[in-house]
A protein has these predicted regions:
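Outer-membrane beta-barrel "beta-signal"
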Residues: 295, 301, 330, 336-337, ...
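Transmembrane beta-barrel strands of outer-membrane/channel proteins
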Residues: 8-16, 53-59, 120-122, 172-176, ...
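Residues that define the transmembrane beta-barrel architecture of outer-membrane proteins
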Residues: 27-37, 100-105, 112, 152-156, ...
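Residue-level signature of outer-membrane beta-barrel architecture
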Residues: 4, 41-45, 111-113, 162-164, ...
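Outer membrane beta-barrel
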Residues: 49-169, 347
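Detector for outer-membrane/organellar transmembrane beta-barrel domains
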Residues: 218-314
């Protein structure tokens, strides 16, 4: 016997972004509205046989309106072409200031055996022990400025997950790139276990002629939560990425965390940020931070049973630039939420090329070229 459900959400954002005028970019003040309608149809068998199945289909459409062609900060979560065998045209309506984007984000079937689950099709795949930046998570992670990150971007894969005891799992699969070409595809094996109350993870991946080996752990240090995640990548170049941090519940309504992230793929000098962003680590390896050393504090506060406040900063410790985000969310009705937010960027502005004025300059700081922005959000779930 089969059963299915249809649910979804409608989210609308209104964003105001400051004007900007520096050596690399000029844009007037930008007003933008973006809506996101996501339909989620899923179901499966309800029999007691040794083989059951489940399936899901998610389709999302995003109408956007902007008064400017230039967007200095990327608020969208549109998936790139990486790790999809083929795809529908992401542009449903191609108009410069009024595009309509679409995304077939899930289309898979899962065969559920006594020994484990086999999932075939477009699905979400994510790894990692860290809370904010995951070194072992290379398959389409969100940029930190994206607003709608509720559902992870789907990739085309064949994946097998086998439970190991009560808390362990062996997870392996193949992810298809464009046209199934080996150079754009990936393979992975990932394991989880629990040893004396400590959650352990390991990962091995091969993607775009790069090899990743990683491990992670989560545990408790008294009243603190602790995590450590690290990965080394060998390919075009060799680099390490590591995240470690702690979290703490100050009260029943206030929760804080801080994470340090080392990004060996990043540039040691801000002059090389733009060229570094063109390397394979950024194009196919899930890296988006341009520098090397970061401190990321975060604080959330339950002001009332229906209102949550949040504060987070990403601080580049080398060039002293930072990205701050402040948010407030209020549960208006059972399925209706109102949100407000503010993005604030601190950093030295980019520097013009004094020797050859026809060539672009360079970034003096990672967040020095980004204008501040405010947004309002209304979300309805059905």
């Amino acid at each position: 016997m089969a059963d299915s459900t249809l649910r979804g959400y409608l989210k609308s954002y209104v964003i105001s972004q400051q004007g900007i005028d520096n050596a690399l970019l000029h844009a007037d003040q930008t007003w933008q509205s973006e809506s996101s309608l996501r339909l989620m149809w899923q179901g499966g068998s309800t029999s007691t046989s040794s083989i059951n199945y489940a399936w899901e289909l998610h389709y999302q459409v995003n109408p956007i309106f902007s008064n400017q062609l230039v967007e200095a900060v990327n608020f969208q979560s549109t998936p790139p072409a990486n790790y999809r065998l083929t795809d529908i045209d992401p542009l449903l309506i191609d108009e410069a200031r009024r595009p309509v984007l679409q995304n077939l984000d899930r289309l898979n079937i899962q065969l559920q055996f006594d020994q484990g689950d086999l999932t075939i099709g477009r699905q979400a795949i994510t790894f990692g022990s860290a809370r904010i930046i995951n070194p072992t998570d290379v398959f389409l992670p969100y940029n930190v400025t994206a607003l709608n990150t509720e559902y992870r971007i789907g990739v085309d894969a064949i994946r097998y997950q086998k439970p190991l005891g009560q808390l362990g799992e062996l997870d392996m699969g193949f992810i298809f790139g464009k046209d199934g070409h080996p150079d754009s595809s990936a393979a992975f094996i990932h394991g989880k276990a629990n040893l004396a109350g400590t959650d352990l993870e390991f990962a091995a991946m091969r993607y775009a002629n790069q090899t990743l080996l990683g491990a992670g752990m989560q545990s408790a240090l008294g009243s603190l939560g602790f995590w450590l995640e690290t990965a080394v990548v060998n390919g075009d170049r060799r680099y390490w990425r590591t995240s470690t941090g702690i979290d703490y519940a100050f009260t029943e309504s206030m929760f804080g965390m801080v994470e340090y992230h080392y990004n060996g793929a990043g540039a040691a000098d801000s002059r090389h940020y733009l060229s570094t962003a063109q390397t394979s680590a950024y194009q196919v390896g899930g890296v988006f931070l341009l520098g090397q050393h970061y401190l990321i504090p975060s604080l959330s506060f339950q002001a009332t049973p229906l209102t949550t406040l949040g504060l987070q900063a990403i601080v580049n410790l080398k060039d002293k630039s930072s990205f701050w985000s402040i948010s407030a969310t209020h549960n208006v009705l059972d399925d209706l939420y109102l949100g407000l937010g503010y993005y604030h960027f601190i950093g030295k502005p980019p520097v013009a090329n004094q020797t050859t004025p026809f060539e672009p300059g360079y970034l003096a700081a990672e967040y020095g070229t980004s204008p501040d922005a405010v947004y309002a959000q209304l979300s309805y779930y059905f």
